[in-house]
Amino acid sequence: MAQSKENTATSPRSKAPAAEKSAAAPAAQAGEKRPRTTRRPYYNRRPRRPQQPKEAAVPIHIYPLGGLGEVGKNMTVYECNGDMIIVDCGLVFPDSDMFGVDMVIPDFTFVVQNKDKIKGLLITHGHEDHIGSIPYLLQKFDLPIYGTRLTCGLIRNKLEEFGLAGKTKFVEITPKQKIKLGCFTIEPIHVNHSIPDAVAFAIDSPAGTIIQTGDFKIDYTPLACGVTDLSTLAEYGQRGVLALLSDSTNAERPGFTATEQKVAAGVRNLFARARNKRIIIATFASNIYRVQQIIDLAVEDGRKVAFSGRSMVNNTAMAQELGYMHIPEGTLIGVEELNQYPPEQVVLITTGSQGEPLSALSRMASCSHRQVRVGPGDFIIISANPIPGNEKSVTKIVNGLLLLGAEVIYESMYDGHVSGHACQEEQKLMLTLTRPKYFLPVHGEYKQLKKHALTAASLGIPTNNILIAENGSNVILTKDEIKLGEPVTAGAVMVDGLGVGDVGNVVLRDRKHLSEDGLVIIVATVDSKTGKVLAGPDLVSRGFVYVRENESLMDGAQSIVENALDRCVEEHVRDWNSVKTRVREALSSYIYRRTKRSPMILPILMEV
């Protein structure tokens, strides 16, 4: 019973006096925390800490305005936190059905609408498909251009033709130099390509790091400038790359791209084969490495060197001025001096490797070059493979040169060209080094983009993290997702002479129509009150038939027009558009029955 009373006395629930409770309290707290028996007053309560909302991931928008689904016209806009930058601004040469068009450039509507947000234009390298549209963009608004030394030099040359070089701000950059533009920090990374000073860009933003490779390959024995900076690419891969935008040009080709050293061996053998003949070599004017190789071989062989073609002359002059090309004193001569030397003592380096109609080699093949006449004493080398779509043009030039008696070496007849773009194994290495979360294949037709996407998937990148975008896509990236937003304006703007954008699909359709079936013009003078024919109708044709051999056809056509005009008078048709339509339809039907052709018919009715 005593034990029971003791327990009752120390129990928290016992009704013992207050003094007895306070005496027992220390014993109760010795081994454990005393439970609270009262609540704090509301005015003394500790407020609950509000739960912090999860911070929204910062998005970055990528807007490709060119270069997807096509080879050329490369242009990409990045936007983050209200700041924008542009990478590249190139052109593409017209398809064969774009009659009279000189070049095609991106649609600048979107960038003009956002010009106040744009902090600068960054250029990966100096090829036309990456710099060719810059003059047309600068005609819209001014912005600073960031590029390596040679790239800026080539752009400056181009802008001088447009009178824009003096007022354009150029910022020369070097690999590993950080550039701060708004919320973006950009680092150029050296890559191999068929032109010196090519770079990729690592673009840091609050959303993460994006790497855009530009045009690249991985050449372990390059002629100059060193190997692609694989260590910097790997460092970014270790830190974490949000997305990779990579060159897809050679995505269908297995293996590695051959080294430029291979070309030197092939051309050296051809120099020996030429013996006592004059050597003419056509190559890309922008391929400074290739031109330097040819110059070095010419010096070894004791030959003088001349250049032909405006872009070849301009590019080589710029490369010499900036120290990218070295020509021994006394080696370079003018093209007008070629005939002052024996054939075995000269080499002519020229444009025209892609069969361009107005190029120097094309003019030689058509005997319209003012200084150079091709004949049996010439040994001609085309040191480039035809770009898809140019095969017929190149073949036409080769045939023309052969007919003149020259010996012509082209395409697969020797190792005279290697690509400047990465093949599958190099693309895999780029993906493996950078380890991107998201992958966007760029710079290629759809089949090449698709193949590059499959290559990325084979390396373990989830298919949900691979996106084949289109020109005008609004690609939205965060650390958590990749998605498409509302598309922006993008497309092709055709340049014809001084006209920019004034040639559209309707004009091209008319030009195609004229090229296929020709033109027939109807000229008649009619009374403005009665509609009766006062003079004519006369018919004039161009590109339709040879009139002297088709007089019966043209006489019949004139009768058809007269009858159509008479019926309009009889039926009191006074609306001149209706009259023209009736005449056009009647003549078109007659001509098609007689010839199975549909020339463009243009009625001209003059009222008196």
Each model region followed by its residue ranges:
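Hard-cation-handling environments
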Residues: 253-383, 387-556, 560-572, 580, ...
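Intrinsically disordered, low-complexity RNA-associated tracts
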Residues: 1-56
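Short Gly/Ser/Thr- and Asp/Glu-enriched loop/turn motifs at secondary-structure junctions
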Residues: 174, 470-472, 597-601
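Short glycine-rich phosphate-binding loop at a beta-alpha junction
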Residues: 144, 440, 602
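A glycine- and charged-residue-rich anion-binding loop/surface
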Residues: 68, 92-102, 106, 117-118, ...
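His/Asp/Glu-rich metal-coordinating catalytic cores
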Residues: 40-122, 127-341, 359-373, 392-396
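C-terminal tails and terminal domains of large nucleic-acid-associated
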Residues: 572-608
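Conserved hydrophobic residues forming the short capping helix/wall of the S-adenosyl-L-methionine
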Residues: 159, 456, 591
